[in-house]
Amino acid sequence: MTNIRNKPAPWIVRAADRGAHMERISHRALPVTMIFILIVGSAVAQETNGQKTTLKELVISALETHERIEIAQSNIRRAQADKKLARSAIMPRINVNGGYTFYGREASIELSPGEEFVIQPAQDWSWSADLRQTLFYGLRPWRAKNIARLNYDIAKLDKQTTINNLTLEVAASFLSTRAAEEGVEVRRVALEQIEGQLKVAERRYEVGEATIADVARWRAEVAGAKQAYVVVKGDAEFARHSLARLTGIEELGSLERLGPVPIPLGDSDTLISTAFEDRWEMKTLYNQLEAAGLWVKLEKGAFLPELDATAQYFQQKSAFPAQGWASLVFSLRVPIYQGGLVKANVAKAREDLRQVELLDQTLRRTIADQVDRAYIGYAAADAALDAARERTNAATEAYRQMERAFRVGEASSVDLLDSTTEAIDAETTHIIARAQREFQAISLRHAIGLFPLPDLDYAEFDKAEE
């Protein structure tokens, strides 16, 4: 089987490898006209009588059940908790303290004969209400609050990225499974027709119109066709089971054929510019850059003085020095020398910022490569589909001519086998080319930041989930 690109998508490579393996096992024989009639009739009956499953339904199920989405949602909840934690550092602290103390003896001062002032009772209690508020901490709590807000936005963007990537994975599995099932139908009909040709060859041998070599050749062809059918059927079943596990659906209906997926307009450069603006990864990077810059400022804040205020109301059993009082204390701490700790933390934060800035170059280059690959891949896949369609038509006509020639003795069984082999190859290539064209269209939408499926809006799904 011929690849339509030097580097096709991985799932297409697997499908092509399976097709090549099938071709090495099964060699020849297939009346193309009958194949088209039986395949179309079987597909129509299956989609009419059985339950149909669309790609959109599979994607929605995967988004609702896959653990990667749950992990992304968990990261959002953690980021939300971090926001509350950072906000709490700005708020005041209120504590109520109490204690009950037993002393070995009572201590008192004799003021006059018969009159004493107890300064330490044998049993004493006290309680206080304390309010502490940071007045200035080098703006570090405010920086931390802004960083937590950015991390929350990053977590939400990461979830959107996960959704797009999972959608692309489901689409690849869906199209691969659909192509595998169509390949099974091709091989099934081919096997039936080859078995029919074997019966014809045996009857012709009985009347002396064919040799024993012709019969042996058709018997070998039947054996190869049976083996090819078993192989492709097993591959299709595995692909179907894998798709069911990926999407969280126990029983899949018949996979509804995916219509032409619309692609975004514009040339490669225009689409790359669009991707730089709309890709979730770029939006995430902008937040990471801002957060890294704030982290440098946060670490620099440790050079600045710290000012705290503490208000307290205190009450005790003892009357010494008083049974109750209120106080307000301002505490100022000026860092003089900390062993180079702050300077080292600032240097680390600056390097983190530098790495994020370098990541911008890497990400832009990666996105540009993805868009170029998807853009060129779609053009190649579309051309390959046209070529496969023409090849199928040509193989159909060639088989008809060869079959007529074989009937009148102008062509041998080897010639008929060759023409039917070409028909099988052409139809299999057509199936894979059609699936690859749709996958490349979905990949192109994904590469520029659009939701891969045009009929599924992420915003609606996210709103429904909340």
List the model feature ranges, each with a label:
Residues 57-63, 249-309, 341, 453-466:
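Amphipathic alpha-helical coiled-coil scaffold segments and their short linker/junction regions
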Residues 46-49, 104, 429-466:
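Acidic, low-complexity, intrinsically disordered peripheral segments
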Residues 48-59:
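Regulatory alphaC helix of protein kinase catalytic domains
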Residues 52-54, 93-161, 283-364, 374-377, ...:
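Small/polar-residue-enriched beta-strand and adjacent coil segments characteristic
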Residues 31-41:
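Bacterial N-terminal signal peptides
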Residues 53, 162-274, 374-377, 381, ...:
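Periplasmic alpha-helical coiled-coil/stalk elements that build and connect Gram-negative outer-membrane
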Residues 4-32:
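Bacterial N-terminal signal peptides that target proteins for export
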